A protein has these predicted regions:
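Bacterial Sec-dependent N-terminal signal peptides
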Residues: 1-24
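N-terminal, motif-rich segments that launch catalysis or mediate targeting to/interaction with membranes
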Residues: 19-126, 133, 138-263
Length: 263
């Protein structure tokens, strides 16, 4: 189904800690987003950014490293209530900051170039982040705050091996790091081949619906992955399909949102 070759899963376990999708994943999503922008939107985006979406996609990660902007760390996370609904109005939540940034872009004539730049950078990053399942928190489900499980290589005896895997890094970097031998452009094209038939379906809705949709994926994933569980490699790999789907949704939805804003 996919043209990407199968890489040894254990190699991806050496992944660096990430704060959301790692840079490679962000760049891949951004490339796929750019592939789905109409010409008018491309020109409007370039006029504001003075560069490409791909080159600006991790700006918010850089911003949070500034001690004076440490409060923005919470913007990378998205809270759902116990019913899986996005109802929060907390200024520290990612969905609220995303909605504020969208409002600026929809009312550009009343905002400075600097404000538009900050807003566009924020939209680019947070639409992507809300599709990283480890950044969705659900009230009453403690596991969504993070946990560690173990992966088993499905061998017994002397060949048996197990290693720790964090919930955060599984979605942030483990799967995408399996494809870093390719460029973000190539990876984006591969995802598009897999997902393009679902583009119209994936592009529907608005940001709060997207977070709720992700919350449903989180609940399903936690049925197989939980604190202290020993999980066979092949079971973990079944979640790679969902990771790819999340990246596709992020790109198609971001493109649809920007095309609508700049129509």
């Amino acid at each position: 189904m996919k043209k990407i070759v199968f890489l040894m899963f254990a190699l991806a376990m050496v992944a660096n800690e990430a704060f959301a999708f790692n840079t490679f994943a962000h760049q891949t999503i951004s490339k796929l987003t750019e592939m789905n922008l109409n010409e008018k939107t491309k020109q409007e985006v370039k006029a504001i950014l003075k560069t490409s979406i791909t080159k600006e996609c991790v700006w918010l990660n850089t911003l949070r490293k500034n001690p004076e902007m440490a409060h923005t760390k919470s913007w990378h996370f998205f809270q759902l209530d116990a019913n899986g609904k996005s109802t929060t109005m907390d200024e520290n939540d990612g969905i609220v900051q995303l909605e504020k940034a969208i409002a600026v872009l929809r009312n550009r004539k009343n905002h400075s170039e600097a404000e538009q730049l900050t807003a566009l950078r924020t939209v680019i990053h947070l639409v992507q982040d809300l599709h990283c399942l480890s950044h969705i928190r659900i009230e009453g489900i403690e596991a969504t705050k993070g946990f560690t499980f173990r992966i088993w290589n499905e061998l017994d005896g002397k060949g048996r091996k197990e290693w720790n895997q964090k919930w955060y890094t599984l979605w942030e970097s483990t799967f995408s790091n399996r494809y870093t031998i390719f460029t973000p452009q190539y990876y984006a094209e591969d995802i598009d081949i897999y997902a393009r038939d679902k583009k119209a379906e994936y592009s529907k809705g608005e940001p709060r619906f997207w977070v709720e949709n992700g919350g449903e994926d989180v609940v399903r994933a936690l049925k197989l992955l939980n604190t202290g569980a020993v999980v066979p490699t092949q079971v973990v790999l079944t979640h790679e399909f969902n990771h790819t789907k999340c990246m596709a949704k992020a790109a198609y939805r971001l493109a649809a949102l920007l095309n609508d804003i700049f129509k």
